[in-house]
Design a protein with these regions (language model features):
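Aromatic-anchored glycine-rich loop motif in surface-exposed flexible loops
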Residues: 1-41
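Aromatic-lined, polymer-binding surfaces characteristic
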Residues: 45
Length: 181
């Protein structure tokens, strides 16, 4: 791992996977110490809990399940984040900085509206917005499983898909997540 400036002719050896993980965790640990002074949610920015969530993710990759669980528990037990109630879940998809969001980039329309550059634009049904791509169709398997419970909150984020447009047969296979701010 390169942690110091190199000369132009330097040829450092490749680090092992273990060495990389060790360096990543060291960097995160060093950062956590600096971020710990303000253990509050900083919407739109990486904060202390973002750091701890990344540590949990790295530990999962390392198969350090106890370490990952301990890091995740720190976030859960902090009380800073709250899971949505089913009644609030659908509306949460169209809002920034929800109560479950540990890290979310803050992007405003004044800075850079993600509308046609967002993942949601590619998932949206063709023609729902000007030039929407309509490249996403939920599988029949997924829709059948979803159909086993008509009260499943995920129906709240589904819309008619391309099959409906082409065949005029209602099929809720398009998703409106990530539509931009």
């Amino acid at each position: 791992n390169v942690t110091e400036p190199l000369t132009v002719n330097a040829q450092p050896t490749r680090a092992t996977v273990e060495e990389n993980y060790r360096q990543i965790l060291q960097d995160l640990s060093d950062g956590a110490a600096l971020l710990a002074k303000k253990k509050t949610k900083q919407s739109g920015y990486a904060d202390y809990y973002t750091n701890i969530a990344l540590q949990a993710r790295v530990k999962l990759y390392m198969e350090d399940y106890d370490g990952a669980l301990n890091a995740a528990r720190e976030i859960i037990e902090s009380g800073v984040y709250k899971l949505y109630e089913p009644a609030d879940w659908t509306a949460s998809w169209s809002k920034q900085f929800g109560s479950e969001s540990i890290f979310e980039l803050g992007i405003t329309t004044e800075e850079s509206h993600l509308g046609t550059s967002s993942l949601g634009f590619y998932l949206m049904r063709y023609g729902q917005l000007k030039n929407a791509m309509g490249w996403y169709l939920a599988s029949d398997y997924f829709l059948n499983r979803l159909g086993e419970d008509e009260t499943d909150v995920r129906w709240g984020i589904m819309d008619n898909d391309e099959y409906w447009v082409d065949n005029e047969i209602e099929r809720k296979g398009a998703c409106y997540k990530y539509m931009g701010s």
